[in-house]
Amino acid sequence: MKGTMEDILILCIGDSNLIGDSLGPLIGSFMYRKVIEDNPSVKVIGTLENPIGYNDLIRITEHLNKRKQEYTTIITIDSALGSSQNIGKIIMDNSTLCAGNGVNSGQELISDISIRGIVGKNYEDAK
């Protein structure tokens, strides 16, 4: 990662009320507690208490577009659907994250690193 710990934004996406979509908020809550303990200047957005659901993504995207220069590293974390053999795996890319593909409505988010936990099968791939 480039920059220092003060320049990192961790964006954890998902709905804490939906089991299959709660990976982001679960990790966000854990990271928030850990980051506040170890380095309060790292920003974590999206927790079980304050989740970032699909309906929030346009607002978050606008925020990131305006304030991208404040962060040298943006990490996005979300649950995702994938092939049967990838369920339970974590996929990490040096690229943007396209959230909402599981509901056939993707929203691309600015990020340097995207982390997706495959939580279920994407039945669209089987067609």
Residues covered by each model-derived region:
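N-terminal catalytic or cofactor-binding beta/alpha core of small enzyme domains
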Residues: 1-74, 79-126
